[in-house]
Amino acid sequence: MKKSIIAFPRIGSNRELKFALEKYFRKEISEDELQIVAKELRLESWKSQKEAGIDYPISNDFSFYDQTLDLSIALGVIPERYKKLKLNELDTLFALARGFQDEENDVKARPMKKWFNTNYHYIVPEISKETVIKANFSKLLNEYQEAKTAGFETRPTIIGPYTFLILADYLSGVTEDAILSDLIGAYTILFDQLNNLGGEWLQIEEPALVLDQTEEEQQLFIKIYQELLKNKNKLRVLLQTYFGDLRNSYQEIIKLDFDGIGLDFVEGRESVKLVQKYGFPKNKLLFAGVVNGKNIWRNHYQKTLSLLKDLGNIDNIVINTSCSLQHVPVTTENETKLSKEILNHFAFAKEKLVEVSEISEIYVKKNTSLLDKNIALFDKNRVQENIQLKQKIIHLTDKDFIRTPSLVERRADQIKALNLPLLPTTTIGSFPQTPEIRKSRLQYKRGELSKSDYEAFLEEKIKECLELQENIGLDVLVHGEFERNDMVEYFGEQLDGYIFTQKAWVQSYGTRCVKPPIVWGDITRPQAMTVRWSAYAQSQTSKPVKGMLTGPVTILNWSFPREDISLKESTLQLALAVQEEVLDLEKSGVKIIQIDEAALREKLPLRRSDWYSEYLDWAIPAFRLVHSKVKAETQIHTHMCYSEFEDIIPSIDAMDADVISFEASRSQLSIIDALKAHHFQTLVGPGVYDIHSPRIPSSQEIKIQLEKILNKLPIEQVWVNPDCGLKTRGNKETIPSLTHLVEATKEVRKGKITYDK
């Protein structure tokens, strides 16, 4: 029985890629030096896979920024405004991802969206009338040859043409038909080139197959591959799917001339039933995704073996991961502070390679010692249940999820209490974390800085931040979040039920890596988490200062959750803990409390029919539970970013927040039309500039954004803010950008323009 994975993390076990890229962006290293780091990371990945017994090591899973963006470059799908910059290929890629600004040019970054239901983000391809497909697969081919030279016969992977078409933005009435023929031709060229190099396999990733499909989309997929697979010659082609099942198209797909088909048996609820009902062709390999590529818990071998048995008499099975391992940390080897007893329960990417091999060995060779060891791990009670918390959740009633008075009724109380101007200006929460701030936090964690000295340092930084905001002229201030390393980890560290790693980093986008905390047991709040800093900040100014919290859904979605209880139960535990914090903030005199739900959409099922019953029916009430007990005059804000929200607008309105800020600038404010169409009741702050790009927007640019918003929404409904928190930016970008934001807002206010609503 062969052993395989879909892809391996590319960031390095110590985030080597992140740090090399940041040096390159600062012009501290050359492209050649950056490429050396990349080559070392690829070699390490292939070695790890081979040493673990993986039969099909993967190439072309490496990317400097994003694999979808790599494909756009390979296909020549580069909008004209980026070509005009006349940059080399790598810098063009970075311009698409980050924007580009110099004395002569000012180009915004392409929109960034969540990769299906993960916390990874992809750069959205843009198709226009000017788009001309021009194949250049040098990256894939070079990395395949690089591996071969190093002694590894790899299976290159690439995102497929169907998924590319589904994910792309189409401008000016253009449809996929405009590029379909050339797109198929480009992949045909890749087949020929890989054949000429002696390539054995090509993995084509088509995760869009697990989404709801129209009849037209099913036919589009079939049309693409009936044509494409005619040209594979000796090359064997694996269709790799993940994040769900193929219930719309399984019967048709197994008829196509693929040599292997990869199915997800972790998130694909119907995958086993599909194989049982319709069978699996004897002339194809079934790449069975049975090792969870998204979570960090050890595989339960008994359950996996039982699942494989349920597939029936299929001889041609390859043990595989359920998705790319880029969604989990690289290895547990660097975790020196967690006990062996705890680490035994975890499998990061390198450990999952071993799991793939062990499952194969147990299945084929009946290795009972490996199986017995795994069974013993799951036979123990890992945590003790909190009975009191369980009872509290059981006895929640409908009233616990409803805030009174209603949204419209309490708005008058808030207007009176806050006395804000039209178009109130604010930020999303965090301010730039300078090397000095990071150094002090690290010194405090290491015991090199006393608590009193560290707190005095933070108070000074908060004062500076408040003074800066007042000088700029913002209406609602924030304390800057200098005490926080991460918007989820910070809270998890103060909640019972969480455990933390040292180096369990996962890529979110580009150079942005996150270290998700792990939900180990039942979650409770032993003491106040943020009141100390929010209350201090409010005492330093007469302007309102927002209390800043992360919401329960986002905390869970950006953690590695338990697998022994439901996501709903874990979320309600978190909601009760955050509710306690909200009430303590209110008691301390904080009048505006922001409860971020940046990741609300992240666990939304990929199929619309499952949205409510499996997610929204408990995720939205969990948010309402958090703020249901606050006073009418306390204003509740929330923030959301980097997802598609247009199709769940009614659910977002049902969160019953008073103000919601959205990421909107990269997506050309497209969410505004949806808000207007759904008669959105909540006050809104669509982000007027993109903070994930280093470029600085002008006052005029922000004014134009505001005018677009006010052409569709009443001025009384609109707040003015950036897209997201400013933590990852520098002061040299933040200060002028916010200054321009306030200047533009004042100009619009002064103009007293009558807008067509």
UniProtKB/Swiss-Prot annotation:
Query: What's its top-level EC category?
Result: transferase
Reactions catalysed: 5-methyltetrahydropteroyltri-L-glutamate + L-homocysteine = tetrahydropteroyltri-L-glutamate + L-methionine
Q: Where does L-homocysteine bind?
A: I428, G429, S430, E481, D596
Which co-factor is required? Answer: Zn(2+)
Q: Name one GO molecular function term.
A: zinc ion binding
Instruction: Report the cofactor remark.
Output: Binds 1 zinc ion per subunit.
What positions does the entry give for 5-methyltetrahydropteroyltri-L-glutamate binding?
R15, E16, L17, K18, K114, R512, C513, W558, E602
**Residues spanning the signal sequence:** none
Instruction: List the Pfam families.
Output: Meth_synt_1, Meth_synt_2
Indicate which residues the UniProt annotation says bind L-methionine.
I428, G429, S430, E481, D596
Q: Which residues form the active site?
A: H692 (proton donor)
Q: Provide the GO biological process annotations.
A: methionine biosynthetic process; methylation
Q: What does the UniProt keyword field contain?
A: Amino-acid biosynthesis, Metal-binding, Methionine biosynthesis, Methyltransferase, Repeat, Transferase, Zinc
Family under the similarity heading:
Belongs to the vitamin-B12 independent methionine synthase family.
Cited HAMAP family: Meth_synth
Q: Which NCBIfam families match?
A: met_syn_B12ind, PRK05222.1
Tell me the function of this protein. Answer: Catalyzes the transfer of a methyl group from 5-methyltetrahydrofolate to homocysteine resulting in methionine formation.
What is this protein identified as? Answer: 5-methyltetrahydropteroyltriglutamate--homocysteine methyltransferase
What organism is this sequence from? Lactococcus lactis subsp. cremoris (strain MG1363)
